[in-house]
Amino acid sequence: ATLDSQNSDFYKKNAEKTLNKLDNLINKIDKSINKKASFVTFHDAYQYFEKRFGIEALGALTINTDIQPGAKQIAEIKDLVEDKNIKCIFSEPQFNPKLINMIAKSTGAETGILDPLGSSFKPGENLYFNLINDLYENLNKC
């Protein structure tokens, strides 16, 4: 706002509007997220979200999306899902859900989709809010 004083009021109003919108979203999630949800993700992409809202993925099929998980990793996740009675396994729209579906079918866990990149959302001023709300809603279904 100081670099473009002619539009200072516009920037300040936008900032205030955005911060209020963010506060409302955070308050909604804080009040109603299922902190006891048991879930596994396709890859470990949600640590900031998990830490901020007091939840934790119990595992991830892969740490690096460039490397497909091997038979050992798949077996370990399958055993984890069975041993911990994990309810949900999440895939991502950017990757083939075949392995997630296979593990879910053999364990009875439900599947869902988490989109850490927001690739399924329309670009624009609401993209971030839609992304965070979608993560919340899908995790809360768990």
Write out the residue ranges for each language-model feature:
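Extracytoplasmic metal-acquisition and chelation regions
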Residues: 1-142
